[in-house]
Amino acid sequence: MAWLAALLAALLAAPWLANDYLLTVLIIILYFAYTGQAWNIMFGFAGQLSLGHAIYVGLGGYAAAALYVHFGIGPWIGLMAAVALGAVCGAIIGFLAFRFGVGGVYFAILTIAFAEFARIGFDHFSWVGGSGGLFLPVANYSQSDIWNLRGKPIMFYYVILALTVATFLLCHVLLRSRVGYYWQAIREDEAAARALGIDTFRYKMYAVVISAGMTSVAGVFFAFYYNNLFPEQVFSIGRSIEIILGPMIGGAGTLAGPIVGAFLLTGLAETMWELLRAVGLDAPGTRQVFYGLVLLVIIIVQPAGVWPWLARLLGLEKPRS
């Protein structure tokens, strides 16, 4: 698609035209676009609502950061450990839920419970800092070391851009594969999908494990970008809500929805924050209030999300039925 190529070209050129603040905002936008796309596999494609996705961010971040801090193992090797840990955790949650028929809102509650268990557990896990947090060595910002993910913000920008593009392409392939068609059948009517001979347990497990593993990668990026991890920070319900806002606003179940939602939500939030700060109204919690208001408006005006409406308006893509 021509519009996708144009967007990618703009994103590739953006760091050379943006100041430090705008570059930071773009990194945050792409981070939420990536995590939103990973969550979109579980809910948007397969219809399994997770409200505890922060557990995978936390597990991935702690796995890679602990290996780096304690053993000097680089983040790219640590990333493999992070993906494995996240996927195993997702498999455990999925197996317990789907084997015993836990679905819908009860599955969502189960995911929150696991995230809370992880938060409490890591609060008392002294090897990774406990409640005091785990800190990575301060990076040398005069140069970039891609192998150790240490260096200038522009390096992190291109890393998260590459991850976001790769995830978009992977989801494009998955959605148009047999697995993707089975996911959509399960999402629309699981009983009917089962009656047609689809192994719903297996394909729901695929969705959970893939989504969990991909989200764990975001945890690695988070740890090395911010240089610290706190259980209250990475396992919180607020972190999970931040992940799902992009696809919910942009359009869950669509490929472009999480990206559009991340740009719209984070871009508007930062603009609003700057305007409020200019007049001295930058009170704590302002962003969260703004997120809630935007989500409320979208649910009322465009419950399917912004992207289906925008795609229909511009003739870019057929709306999802």
Predicted features by range, described:
Residues 1-321:
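Transmembrane alpha-helices and adjacent helix-loop boundaries
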